[in-house]
């Protein structure tokens, strides 16, 4: 509890300083320290990001930040981790030539293959690490949700979440076209260029794992293309098809039929 108190005081004082002296009332959840470390504060609801990163670091060669320590308290989870030098891919992608882009794609594809190869401990359970509740901005209006015993239960939840905005007949048609007989694989859940740090044409780190967990195998593809408020880059959208190991265009289009109407999910 002492660590959580120190982190909370740090965020309170730093937020006060930024708001009062720098005219920055909304400073975000991440603070970069001068000692080569980063502090992140997140909600207790849903995934335990620190343990997810430790799990990925232990079981794959995917580059992730090193966690120095983590703790919980005051309704928040705090994580102290190393600062990874580099540029976010969202910015670097626009200036890369075809060879550089191909190198990035090759690395990212190999990392997703590793991620999807992790053995699910309790398949077909759809959940975060350790069988806990899921957290996803696709359904952020509902906070944490799940876990779900099966993929079918997860799909039922997606349809239920869309019910306030979509006619029942239309939803029943969408649900009838969802395939429940698919694998559950470990999924980053927010595999976007803003969460990939590069140095030149080398992937330095993949960050922001708070939405990760065991999801239907198509979910990574759907979420990689889900950016309602972000920069839409068609070249990146096309590239996602070469990064995710299988074709899930059908599942993505089906999900879009719902999300195009779901104002509350955005």
Where are these regions (language model features)?
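Active-site Asp-x-Gly
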Residues: 151, 181, 185-186, 199-249
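Juxta-kinase regulatory segment immediately upstream of eukaryotic protein kinase catalytic domains
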Residues: 1-20
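ATP-binding pocket architecture of kinase catalytic cores
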Residues: 19-140, 148, 183
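Charged phosphate-binding loop/patch that engages nucleotide di/tri-phosphates or the phosphate backbone
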Residues: 20, 239-266
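Plant-skewed but cross-kingdom recognition/interaction modules and surfaces
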Residues: 45-49, 193, 202
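Catalytic-loop of the protein kinase fold
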Residues: 186-188, 193
């Amino acid at each position: 509890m002492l660590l959580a108190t120190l982190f909370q005081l740090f965020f309170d004082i730093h937020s006060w300083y930024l708001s009062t002296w720098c005219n920055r009332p909304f400073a975000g959840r991440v603070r970069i320290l001068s000692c080569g470390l980063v502090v992140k504060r997140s909600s207790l609801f849903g995934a335990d990001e620190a343990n997810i990163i430790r799990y990925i670091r232990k079981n794959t060669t995917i580059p992730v930040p090193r966690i120095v320590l983590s703790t919980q308290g005051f309704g928040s989870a705090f994580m102290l981790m190393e600062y990874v030098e580099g540029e976010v891919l969202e910015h670097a992608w626009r200036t890369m030539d075809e060879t550089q882009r191909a190198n990035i794609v090759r690395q990212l594809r190999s990392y997703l293959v590793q991620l999807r190869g992790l053995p699910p401990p309790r398949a077909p359970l759809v959940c975060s690490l350790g069988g806990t509740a899921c957290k996803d901005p696709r359904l952020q209006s509902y906070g944490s949700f799940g876990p779900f015993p099966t993929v079918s239960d997860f799909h039922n939840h997606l349809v239920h979440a869309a019910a306030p905005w979509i006619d029942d007949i239309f939803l029943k048609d969408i649900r009838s076209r969802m395939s429940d007989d698919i694998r559950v694989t470990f999924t980053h859940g927010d595999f976007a260029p803003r969460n990939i740090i590069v140095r030149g044409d080398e992937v330095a780190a993949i960050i922001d794992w708070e939405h990760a967990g065991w999801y239907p195998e198509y979910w990574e593809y759907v979420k990689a293309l889900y950016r309602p408020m972000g920069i839409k880059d068609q070249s990146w959208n096309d590239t996602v098809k070469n990064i995710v190991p299988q074709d899930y265009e059908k599942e993505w289009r089906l999900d879009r039929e719902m999300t195009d109407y779901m104002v509350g999910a955005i």
